[in-house]
Amino acid sequence: MENLLSVKDLSKQQILDLLALAKAVKANPAEYSQALAGKSIVTIYEKPSLRTRVTFDIGIHKLGGHAVYLDAQNGAIGERETVKDFAANISRWADAIVARVVSHKTLEGLVEHGSVPVVNSLCDLYHPCQALADFLTISEHYEDVSKVKLAYVGEGNNVTHSLMLTGAILGAEVTAVCPRGSSPDAQIVKQAMALAEISGGKINVTDNLDDIVDYDVIYGDTWVSMGDDTPLAQVKEKYMPYQINKALLMRTGIKHVLHCQPAHRELEITSEVMDGEHSLIFDQAENRMHAQNAVLLTLLK
C-alpha cells in the first residue's frame, strides 16, 4: 500500500491487516508510542472538521510523530499555486500528506506530483478512513465481518460509497436505502457489485426499509452533505420517513446503530437511539483514531 485514496485499491487481506493492526494499537498503545518518531505528517483541510482533525492530530502524537496543520486560509489547493508545486514542496519536508479536500482530483494530483504517501481523509467521492473505522467497530462485535448485513439509510454520498466498497471487498452484504433521486453514484455501485461478485458479498440499492428486516447494523448520516447549502427544512419531508428511531429498530430487528457524525438529533436519528443501548456511535468515533493510526503505520513502516 503506497497511498490510501479509496478502499477499492485495497485487497481483502490488506483491509483485514489494517483492522488487526488498529486493534493491536488500540489494545497496547505504549508499544507503538514511538512508532512514528521523527516523522512529520502534513494534514490539509479544505473542509471543516472535528473528528478527522482531532483524531489525526492526537493519533499522530500518540505514535510519536509530528502533525502540521494547514487550513484553507490560502484558498483551495491549486489556487495560490499549482497542485504540482504544492505537492513537490510538501514532499521535500514531510513524510506523508493527509488531505480532506473538495475534489478527488486534488488527491490524484498530490499523488502524481508528490513523492510521499497520501491519505484521503475525505473527498467528494470517498471517505476511506471512515469506512475502515466503521468496519473496525463492526468487527469488535461480529467475529466474521463477511457475514454481517449492514444497511446505510439516507442520502447516497461519499460515506455510502466507501461502505459499499469496503463491504464488497470483505464479502459482507451492504444495502443502501435511499429516497428516490438520492441513490449513490451508479458507477461506484457498479464497481462495488463487481467486487462483491468476487468476494461472495452482496450490494443492494433500494428505497424500501422493509428490505433491511433482520439486518445486523444500521448506519445514518446527515441528510445534507458537507458543502451543500440546501436548508435541512427543504429536505426534511423527503427524508423523515427514513429517520433512524426506536420504531425502525423494532420493525427491522436491527441490533446495532452507527452514525459518522455530525448528527442532527431528532432529524436523521433520534436522541433515544443515539444514546441508547443499540448505539455504537461513540465507539465508532473513537475508532477513527485507531483505524487511521493503522493506515499511517502501514504507509510509513
UniProtKB/Swiss-Prot annotation:
The enzyme is present as a mixture of trimers and dodecamers, with the relative proportions of the two forms depending on the salt concentration. In addition, the trimeric fraction could reassociate into dodecamers when the salt concentration is increased. It appears that in vivo, the main fraction is in the dodecameric form. Transmembrane segments: none annotated. Pfam families: OTCace, OTCace_N. Carbamoyl phosphate binds at R100, H127, P128, C129, Q130, C260, R288. GO terms for molecular function: amino acid binding; ornithine carbamoyltransferase activity. Reversibly catalyzes the transfer of the carbamoyl group from carbamoyl phosphate (CP) to the N(epsilon) atom of ornithine (ORN) to produce L-citrulline, which is a substrate for argininosuccinate synthetase, the enzyme involved in the final step in arginine biosynthesis. Its EC number is 2.1.3.3. InterPro entries: Asp/Orn_carbamoyltranf_P-bd, Asp/Orn_carbamoylTrfase, Asp/Orn_carbamoylTrfase_sf, Asp_carbamoyltransf_Asp/Orn-bd, Orn/put_carbamltrans, OTCase_ArgI. Keywords: Amino-acid biosynthesis, Arginine biosynthesis, Cytoplasm, Transferase. It catalyses: carbamoyl phosphate + L-ornithine = L-citrulline + phosphate + H(+). Its main location: cytoplasm. This is Ornithine carbamoyltransferase. Inhibited by excess of arginine and by the bisubstrate delta-N-phosphonoacetyl-L-ornithine (PALO). One of its GO terms (biological process) is citrulline biosynthetic process. Optimum pH is between 9 and 10. One of its GO terms (cellular component) is cytoplasm. The keyword Cell cycle does not apply. It is an enzyme of class 2 (transferase). L-ornithine binds at N158, D221, S225, M226. Optimum temperature is between 23 and 25 degrees Celsius. 37% of this maximal activity could still be observed at 5 degrees Celsius. HAMAP family: OTCase (MF_01109).
